[in-house]
């Protein structure tokens, strides 16, 4: 009878071990009927719509756009008006007379930034009267046009155009910076999606091993009660169950933290990732070419180029500001005078005009010189930053390409090791069946297989993350 039971238990334990080992090759099924499967793109779209960092980046672009809008105010038409009243005592032929003047003027001024020209036009009216017997009031209406044309400083509107051109450059730079900053902010969530799948796969794997380990434990307990195995096998069987349970709970803690983080964006929705995205993205990551794209072809390099061009342009304007202010000025006025207001406005038959030059030049011009020196230093600084970023890019790109090649080799070795461990397991199982090996040795090999399979899942996720970093780093404008 004992011989018969011994044969039965020898069959049961290897069968249970085979169940444990086979469980690692499959994935335990979950009840996912009520869960909504969310694809990778939909996941990112949802994050991008809510991520506050991205909203902040968009605000920076809107601020730059608003600055551009406001920069054109230099060419706005300005309306001006003035009115005055005065009383003066004048002496005429030994007598004192009271002179009263009323004057008003209204006009429009427009600056043409493309040429550095300022044009004003308007109308004026003066009324003068003397308080004396028989005196009358005189009316002086007038129309005028005058201009101011810069010849040295601000020649052809180089200074007037600066505000608009600088704002345009800053707007273009900010739009590129938004893309780069958005990419950096969303990079974490791209990887988080595949970490989510990784945790799920590992939890399923551990759950299936726990099921198999419990079957081993029950089989060994029965055999122990019959006195067919010693306490060591019983402890080993119980220990492997606890080992997998601890590993499961530790990983489940990480999964709960991940779900809590995602809950910020998905508001307690019962969602799961599309597990098919993992092998598809992994295949893309493995088959893509990791080219050594030069830094000057990337969007970051384009940002540097635009920034440098902006600084060079600023330096040119600053140099122009060091020139003297030499302007060609002129005015043309039509006017008339009459004691009758109606007659004075009927025919503006008198003409005044002048043409001349205006010259001003600060002897030190400290502010403009300081601005020019500051801009030249900024150009030197941006050149240094470009070189630093170029070196950093080359370092990062080299590491990514190297990591990809290394990961391919390591993955091949790990998969080969799983094959060897499988063979080792079968050999040890045979020895155990022949009572030439203890249960713990077989269990240790099963644990090695488990760890190696988990390492393969993690390595594949690292390959995906490496590809995401490569795509972000080398993205062109």
Language-model features: locations:
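Periplasmic alpha-helical coiled-coil/stalk elements that build and connect Gram-negative outer-membrane
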Residues: 2-3, 7-10, 30, 165-169, ...
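Bacterial N-terminal signal peptides
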Residues: 13-22
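Bacterial Sec-pathway N-terminal export signals of envelope proteins
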Residues: 28-102, 153, 159-162, 166-168, ...
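Small/polar, glycine/serine/threonine/aspartate-rich low-complexity segments that form flexible
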Residues: 31-34, 83-149, 279-283, 316, ...
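Amphipathic alpha-helical coiled-coil segments
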Residues: 54-71, 181-206, 240, 258, ...
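Sec/SRP-type N-terminal targeting helices
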Residues: 55-59, 72, 113-138, 152-177, ...
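Coiled-coil termination/hinge junctions
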Residues: 71-72, 78, 262, 314-319, ...
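Metallo-beta-lactamase
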Residues: 251, 299, 382, 459
